């Protein structure tokens, strides 16, 4: 996502909690990070990275990380009038809390979690689920249109996170269904590559079938989205459902499967590692 912004001409100042990621961004953008005039500036810490920012983008793993970075000095370091675009997937409550705190300091905030996997991030074809004031969303739109090809404003702050929870419920069910289906077809001795091609053209067609079925059949799980992070997202979805007195039995079942895989050491693999469960 950062590399696409850099290619599009946005001047970037980067900070990542994992050292060296600035070099990865420069390489993905086709730049020589040591010599290119438009290579990203690298902040020694998060506060340095945002000191002159008109827009600050976050993409962190969870609520704890987002609050640690924001409340660890970033809020105070941001220039008055700056806009925070939060691509992280976190609870709606944390998004609303941050928006309120930032507003008190003359700052704006939108939640903008994304879906589309690593493939979509690299291609700039993510779907961006946005919550925030219309003026703030309009201000962010030129940037959002670089990282995604579908930008959907869903309501006030927190609405983007709620929509992302809905998305992750669908991901849970679809990935688990594809894993089950691949296991059944394989046990029946069917020519599964041909079966998958046939099913893609019918009512069972889905993103998970299109992009993950073959990997499941080959028992390889190159990282698109970490299983452990998806489990974190399911916790958000289950919490949201509980708040509105709704039971999600399919999601709860997939969460239990993911718990068992994480306990077995597979949390850093792609969500498609759900297929491992059916080989146990």
Regions found by a protein language model. Name each.
Residues 1-5, 98, 143, 184:
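Hydrophobic residues within alpha-helices
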Residues 1-58, 82, 87-88, 118:
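NAD(P)+-binding Rossmann beta1-loop-alpha1 motif at the extreme N-terminus of oxidoreductases
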Residues 17-18, 62, 133:
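Residues in the short beta-alpha loop(s) of Rossmann-like NAD(P)-binding domains
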Residues 46-109:
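Rossmann-fold NAD(P) dinucleotide-binding segment
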Residues 89-169:
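Rossmann-fold dinucleotide-binding core
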Residues 161, 205-271, 278-280:
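Interdomain hinge/lid region at the active-site interface
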Residues 123-124, 128-131, 156-188, 199-211, ...:
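Active-site-proximal catalytic alpha-helix in oxidoreductases
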